[in-house]
């Protein structure tokens, strides 16, 4: 009852839904207000504090682009490349909530949750902007921010066409 088919497209016989994906869009929701979102509590991280959005946006700019995201990967034994491209990290604030939309060519194990924890640490002034840039160089999971809870995270869309842009998908 939570999943619905919104579109059907004919694909080649050798198409693989995971291997042929060219990108993904994830949304992470954070409650920052004093009033609890009772009916949404399973789908939103109740952070309970209001971080500095301007600092978080500046940190997001540092993380956008093609980088080695090993510091943001929970799998310490990752054998494959940890280089990924984040096309955009969009932060919006509305009614006691922060919504972060991540668009990229692929994401590592717990990468979105670790990125979110790191952005929140910056927003709470527990981490400097310069330390965010250093995380891309040191490639050490222990240096990055906390892993935000899974309940705020939603896979919004899987992209398949190299021509498909975020503006066409939302």
Language-model features: where?
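Structured-RNA-binding interfaces characteristic of tRNA pseudouridine synthases
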Residues: 1-170
């Amino acid at each position: 009852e939570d999943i619905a088919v919104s579109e059907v497209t004919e694909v080649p016989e050798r198409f693989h839904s995971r291997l042929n994906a060219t990108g993904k869009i994830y949304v992470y929701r954070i409650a920052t207000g004093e009033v609890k979102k009772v009916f949404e509590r399973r789908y939103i991280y109740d952070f309970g504090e209001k971080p500095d959005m301007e600092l978080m946006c500046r940190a997001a700019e540092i993380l956008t682009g093609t980088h080695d995201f090993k510091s943001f990967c929970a799998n310490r034994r990752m054998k494959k490349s940890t280089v990924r491209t984040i096309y955009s990290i969009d932060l919006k604030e509305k009614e006691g909530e922060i919504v972060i939309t991540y668009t990229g060519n692929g994401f590592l194990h717990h990468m979105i949750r670790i990125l979110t924890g790191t952005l929140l640490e910056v927003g709470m002034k527990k981490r400097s902007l310069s330390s965010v840039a250093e995380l891309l160089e040191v490639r050490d999971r222990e240096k990055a921010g906390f892993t935000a809870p899974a309940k705020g995270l939603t896979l919004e869309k899987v992209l398949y066409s190299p021509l498909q842009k975020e503006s066409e998908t939302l």
